[in-house]
A protein has these predicted regions:
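Glycine-rich loop(s) and the adjacent beta-strand/alpha-helix scaffold that form part
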Residues: 33, 40-43, 225-228, 234-324
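Short loop/edge segments at beta-strand edges and connector loops
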Residues: 218-220, 285-287, 481
Length: 557
């Protein structure tokens, strides 16, 4: 039997963006004892905080789970590296730092699918509450919150020209992607403070380290959720080399992400019956949708060689260039070392019939064959484009009951023919932008996938050959009703009192953009609902105490 260490009001699994925010909000009431558990270590690795350091965090077991997908039929049988944050701050410690809420229609669609309370109008105040926006308070933005948003600290002549070329192609320039309709082209706003990464640990934990009612444990790997009489009561946790048990008086909240949360449920005997029986887990509670509905944004990284303009390829390729970058960052926290992985963004429609922008571009003044490999020696830029609303759906399944064994991750990219059509249209649109007059002075030449891909069939084949994840998995514990839903609109796991999920896994459908800030608003909403429920339950007790006190006074009088 695991050793029982302690009992808390709330147990939170995973100190990624959602877990950090939840720990902050739930522990704001001193009456709540809160335990936050993180499988990774503290966020004290220097490369986490230097923005360009994501290159040294992705694929590094110190900060990354280092997952791989199964072989994906739609990608010519390729398996992809599938990074997920394993460190305090989670993916906010290794991601691209892009601040992106998505589109209003994303959240309104969740409501239309039977999830009241999740509309854009209802979530906007929560986005604003957490924000510390460089522009200050406005109708759309907040100031003084924990989640710092800044302008980037450099621009590139080549990217300015791409923005002009996009305008010449019909994609208007915009200053802010976060007003509910992100269509247009402009520089991304980023989660940085003074040229340093601003992760969820800094934003939501460091300022409250003195709270006596909050405990944060790192290197604590949660093995299983333990039920008693059908209710989630405790967690079995591997910590300091031993299996321990932590108990919850009120609730357990899973914030382990779109991969971690369904795997934890499955190891706990909660999930599809056939999987649980095959692995000998025992069916504690059948929920067929656990681990299904996996969605992700597939990026097509198109590369163009250029002439007559500096790119990071040349700057980082010389000793003097590296020295200059380092000195500039030390002196002013600016220059290439302060760069988010992608600086310029664009949201566009793959065809005029789309109701809103369904493509996102991440444009970079650099190129490489794949993450972890050196930059090319020739000057080039990358125009990465992804389908924001993929129809393909995948799965996440544990391979065994051993928490140390990586799961089966099958994204099933491009398995739906509609996604192949959008991919081909996206390549054609990118070529039109590259051929616009604003870029002509730099003589862009398509290097990847290559001009030889021309027909519809060619372009779909190119997408299968160059497509890769842009690290936005979601949907594996979807919110809603019906047989495939895992949580209700209150984020309560169907059929299991005392257990909620608050992370990207609950999204019924992907948001139209980067997913970190949408995950934060999910956690903000979850905290609001949890605390409201606590107040409702406490109200009768307060009334009873008041009446008892009043009755005593009446007798004494």
């Amino acid at each position: 039997m695991p050793e029982v260490l302690d009992t808390y009001d709330y147990l939170i699994v995973g100190a990624g963006p959602a877990g950090c925010l939840l720990a902050n909000r739930l522990s704001a009431d001193p009456a709540n004892r809160v335990l936050l558990l993180e499988a990774g270590g503290p966020d004290n690795y220097p490369w986490i905080h230097i923005p360009v350091g994501y290159l040294y965090c992705i694929g590094n077991p110190r900060t990354d789970w280092c997952f791989d997908t199964d072989e994906v039929p739609g990608l010519k049988g390729r398996s992809l590296k599938y990074p997920r944050g394993k460190v305090l701050g989670g993916c906010s410690s290794i991601n691209g730092m892009i601040y992106m809420r998505g589109q209003a229609r994303d959240y309104d669609q969740w409501v239309a699918e039977g999830n009241p309370g999740w509309s854009w109008r209802e979530l906007l105040p929560l986005f604003r509450r957490m924000e510390d926006h460089f522009a200050g308070t406005s109708e759309m933005h907040g100031a003084g919150g924990e989640w710092r948003v800044e302008r980037q600290r450099l621009s590139w002549k080549l990217l300015d020209a791409f923005q002009q070329a996009a305008a010449q192609t019909g994609i208007a320039s915009v200053e802010d992607f976060n007003g509910g309709d992100n269509e247009g082209c402009g520089y991304f706003q980023v989660n940085q403070r003074g040229g340093v990464r601003w992760n969820a640990s800094k934003g939501f934990l460091r300022g409250i380290a003195q709270r006596a009612n909050l405990t944060v444990l790192t290197h604590a790997e949660v093995q299983r959720v333990l039920l008693e009489d059908g209710r989630a009561r405790a967690l079995s946790v591997r910590w300091q080399g031993r299996e321990r048990r932590f108990e919850a008086r009120r609730e357990i909240v899973l914030s382990a992400g779109a991969i971690g949360s369904p795997c934890l449920l499955q190891r706990s005997g909660i999930g599809p019956q056939d999987l649980l029986e095959r692995l000998g887990a025992g069916v504690v509670h059948e929920l067929p949708g656990v681990g299904g509905n996996l969605q992700d944004h597939l990026q097509l990284r198109m590369i163009y060689k250029v002439d007559g303009v500096p790119t990071l390829n040349q700057i980082a390729g010389s000793l003097w260039g590296k020295l200059g970058m380092g000195l500039r960052y030390l002196a002013s926290r600016s220059g290439p070392l302060s760069m988010a992985p992608s600086q310029l963004g664009a949201f566009a429609r793959s065809d005029p019939q789309q109701p809103s922008a369904n493509l996102e571009y991440h444009v970079q003044p650099l190129s490489l064959d794949r993450f972890g490999e050196p930059l090319h020696t020739f000057p080039a830029f990358t125009a990465s484009v992804c389908d924001l609303r993929p129809h393909s759906r995948g799965t996440v399944r544990i391979r065994s009951l051993d928490p140390g064994e990586a799961p089966s991750i099958q994204p099933n990219y491009l398995s739906d023919p509609r996604d192949l059509t959008v991919a081909a249209d996206a390549i054609r649109l990118t070529r039109r932008i590259a051929a616009a007059p604003a870029l002509a002075a730099f003589r862009p030449q398509e290097y990847k996938p290559g001009p030889e891909y021309r027909s519809e069939e060619d372009l779909q084949r190119a997408a299968a050959e160059i497509g890769t994840t842009i690290f936005h998995p979601a949907g594996t514990c979807r919110m809603g009703q019906g047989s495939q839903a895992v949580v209700d609109a209150q984020l309560r796991v169907h059929g299991i009192p005392g257990l909620r999920i608050a992370d990207a896994s609950i999204m019924p459908s992907l948001t139209s953009g980067n997913t970190c800030s949408p995950v934060l608003v999910i956690a903000e909403k979850a905290a609001q609902m949890i605390l409201a429920e606590r107040r409702r339950e406490a109200a009768p007790q307060v009334l009873e105490s008041a009446m008892a006190a009043g009755g005593k006074e009446a007798v004494e009088a």
